[in-house]
């Protein structure tokens, strides 16, 4: 029995389609083969040292180069030495559930013994009339709890502001300092674990060009708080370049308490 094939004109009709199909497949495969493989982001080259730089925030936990930590310690020492020549105004504001509860001001300066001195300015805020009875007792207890929390918060902040060079050194020697590059060769954050108390983290954001501190981020356990508290410190600079903590902000959402501390009005301290 004789097989019947496709008419020649049918073959001529489908030939370009078949050839096109194979050519298309070949082009796709060739393109895929030639496409460059994805490569990780290139790390930035070190500026002046032989220590490798970290180029992305994904490098959290990488040991901090000794040069960076040394620069941080020197910056802290330099700023603190210069600030001992100044006096300034400190304004502390305590808030509860969005309402300002107290505002105090103090003139601050370093005494001859090297300790920070604070002299209250103005009258102490007047306390509200006490309520009597069971309700008054509840309010009184609540007020005492909040007052105690505020005192603990203030004490916690003092452990980190300003940073202490000797504690930075201790963290470095314990191998608990790490670095994250926020902006290659411009900004980095050095995280100091177990800086003041076990379980805390002091993050110091630095300008790598000037080696000045830009900000602090702190997470620390605190007496009277079930959860660790967090607060941020923004730094500014005097005309001579000396860095100082311009504003500290603690927001304890657990109890609705906020603490704001602002430093301003720096001037050379008058000595007798």
What are these model-predicted stretches?
Residues 14-26:
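Bacterial N-terminal signal peptides
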Residues 76-137:
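Solvent-exposed N-terminal domain segments of exported/luminal and surface proteins
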Residues 124-200, 220-225:
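Flexible, processing/modification-adjacent segments and terminal tails
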Residues 1-12:
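N-terminal secretory signal peptides that target proteins for export/translocation
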Residues 181-272:
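Gly/Pro-enriched, hydrophobic low-complexity segments
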Residues 28-89:
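N-terminal leader/targeting segments and the immediate start of mature chains
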Residues 72-80, 92-95, 164-167, 176-178, ...:
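Intrinsically disordered, low-complexity boundary segments flanking structured domains
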């Amino acid at each position: 029995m004789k097989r019947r094939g496709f008419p020649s004109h049918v073959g001529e009709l489908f030939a370009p389609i078949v050839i096109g199909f194979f050519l298309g497949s070949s082009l796709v495969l060739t393109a895929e083969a030639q496409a460059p493989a994805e490569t990780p982001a290139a790390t930035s080259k070190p500026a002046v040292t032989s220590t490798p730089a970290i180029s992305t925030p994904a490098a959290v936990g990488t040991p901090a180069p000794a040069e960076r930590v040394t620069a941080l310690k020197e910056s802290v020492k330099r700023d603190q030495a210069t600030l001992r020549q100044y006096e300034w105004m400190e304004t502390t504001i305590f808030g509860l559930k969005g309402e300002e509860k107290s505002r105090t001001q103090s003139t601050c300066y370093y005494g001859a013994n090297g300790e920070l001195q604070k002299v209250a300015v103005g009258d102490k805020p007047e306390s509200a009339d006490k309520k009597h009875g069971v309700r008054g007792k509840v309010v009184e207890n609540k007020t005492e709890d909040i007052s105690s929390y505020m005192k603990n918060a203030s004490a916690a902040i003092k452990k980190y502001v300003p940073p202490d060079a000797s504690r930075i050194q201790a963290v470095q020697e314990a191998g608990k300092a790490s670095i994250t590059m926020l902006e290659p060769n411009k900004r980095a954050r050095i995280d100091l674990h177990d800086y003041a108390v076990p379980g805390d983290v002091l993050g110091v954001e630095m300008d790598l060009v000037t080696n000045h501190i830009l900000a602090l981020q702190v997470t620390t356990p605190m007496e009277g708080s079930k959860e660790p508290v967090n607060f941020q410190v923004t730094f500014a600079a005097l005309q001579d370049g000396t860095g100082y903590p311009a504003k500290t902000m603690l927001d304890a959402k657990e109890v609705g308490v906020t603490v704001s501390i602002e430093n301003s009005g720096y001037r050379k301290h008058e000595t007798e």
